[in-house]
Curated annotation (Swiss-Prot):
One GO term (biological process): translation
Gene behind the chain: rplS
Gene3D superfamilies, alphabetized: 2.30.30.790
PANTHER family, per the entry: LARGE RIBOSOMAL SUBUNIT PROTEIN BL19M, RIBOSOMAL PROTEIN L19
Organism classification: Bacteria, Pseudomonadati, Pseudomonadota, Alphaproteobacteria, Hyphomicrobiales
Keywords: Ribonucleoprotein, Ribosomal protein
Protein name: Large ribosomal subunit protein bL19
Highest rank taxon of the organism: Bacteria
Amino acid sequence: MNIIEQLEAEQAAKIAAKRTLPDFSAGDTVRVNVRVVEGSRTRVQAYEGVCIARSGGGLNESFTVRKISYGEGVERVFPVYSPLVESVEVVRRGKVRRAKLYYLRDRRGKSARIVENTGTRARKLNEAERQAVAEEKARIEAEKVAAAQALAAEKAAAEAAEKAAAEAKAAEAAAE
């Protein structure tokens, strides 16, 4: 493995430790939660549509999501390893025979529909995904509880130190 591949693998592992993306391909309806910066505020915006392509490899891998917004087709390309992509949820698995669904650009209405994949592989992926999401939520909740307990203990220690200092000051004043 050359140096560039090694660096890419390290970066991919670093990002994968923070968040894991589900296994999805072209034809799947996905909801991408994107971090949007507006001035000094940041918020998370959901972008839901059909994944029409996955391209590239390694750190340069990206996927294209198409949705219809107010009657106008909108496509957005998301890098898989972008820090702005907070999470990706697979809403529905699609059954298609192509890797690139660019032909959907020319279609409207019923002809642009994608049949839902109800095969065993899709069901297994959906179940595994739901379980992974539940585990992730439980882990985050546990981290929040631990952080709250640590903060409460820190506050209690600070109050005790403050109380002891006040008592020492009062004892010193009484001694004079």
